[in-house]
Amino acid sequence: MIFFSILITIFAYFLGSISSAILICKILRFPDPRNFGSKNPGATNILRIAGLKIAISVILFDILKGAIPMWLGYHLKISPIFLGATAVFSCLGHMYPIFFKFYGGKGVATAFGVLTTIDLHLSIVMISSWTLTVLSFGYSSLGAIVTAFIIPCYAWHFQSQYLLPTIIISSLVVIKHAANIKRLWHHKENRIWRK
């Protein structure tokens, strides 16, 4: 079982490394998101580059990247320790993809896919927190940052055995938003609807 647990964790990283934002833009002949807009291969930048439908497809793909390895792990009944590792490596794959020179997205949708499989309450908290923040202030990045700080508290309450991986994932999300935090501080961050 340890062998399969390690295999799933490795699979999670490689699946996470498939960047839907880059591939979809390449197939549909949109600009490379790494060289356009915020230069982030994530759904918010895709929204600005290619529109809502393409952005939604990127979000769905990124959610599945996080959810599929976790579902597989649950099905094979691997231990919570390896499930936690699978969760972290899914997000690491998205953020630092081996197929794209380790330059990836910020992991929000993939983290959502991971946390949804851990506990439905966590996905509800993520959606609510992100939506309320974005509707209040208009910044997708701020929604992600606020949610990253909040979600470990709920993980501790609902699924305490996954608190550590949740803290690691949340920390990674905040780290990947370092440039956004600087722009927010200096009032230079673009709102979600601005191209």
UniProtKB/Swiss-Prot annotation:
GO-annotated cellular components: plasma membrane
Where's it found, cell-wise? Answer: Cell inner membrane
Which pathway does the protein contribute to? Lipid metabolism; phospholipid metabolism
Which spans are transmembrane here?
Answer: 2-22, 54-74, 80-100, 107-127, 132-152, 155-175
In short, the EC number is 2.3.1.275
InterPro entries recorded for this chain? Answer: G3P_acylTferase_PlsY (IPR003811)
Its chief place of residence is membrane
Q: Which GO terms describe its molecular function?
A: acyl-phosphate glycerol-3-phosphate acyltransferase activity
**Reaction(s) catalysed by this chain's protein:** an acyl phosphate + sn-glycerol 3-phosphate = a 1-acyl-sn-glycero-3-phosphate + phosphate
Any one Gene Ontology BP term: phospholipid biosynthetic process
Q: Which UniProt keywords apply?
A: Cell inner membrane, Cell membrane, Lipid biosynthesis, Lipid metabolism, Membrane, Phospholipid biosynthesis, Phospholipid metabolism, Transferase, Transmembrane, Transmembrane helix
* Pfam family membership, one: G3P_acyltransf
Q: How does it sit in the membrane?
A: Multi-pass membrane protein
Say which family it is in: Belongs to the PlsY family.
Q: Which PANTHER family match?
A: GLYCEROL-3-PHOSPHATE ACYLTRANSFERASE-RELATED, INNER MEMBRANE PROTEIN YGIH
Q: How does it assemble?
A: Probably interacts with PlsX.
Q: What is this protein's function? A: Catalyzes the transfer of an acyl group from acyl-phosphate (acyl-PO(4)) to glycerol-3-phosphate (G3P) to form lysophosphatidic acid (LPA). This enzyme utilizes acyl-phosphate as fatty acyl donor, but not acyl-CoA or acyl-ACP.
Extract the HAMAP family matched here. Answer: PlsY
This chain belongs to which protein, by name? Glycerol-3-phosphate acyltransferase
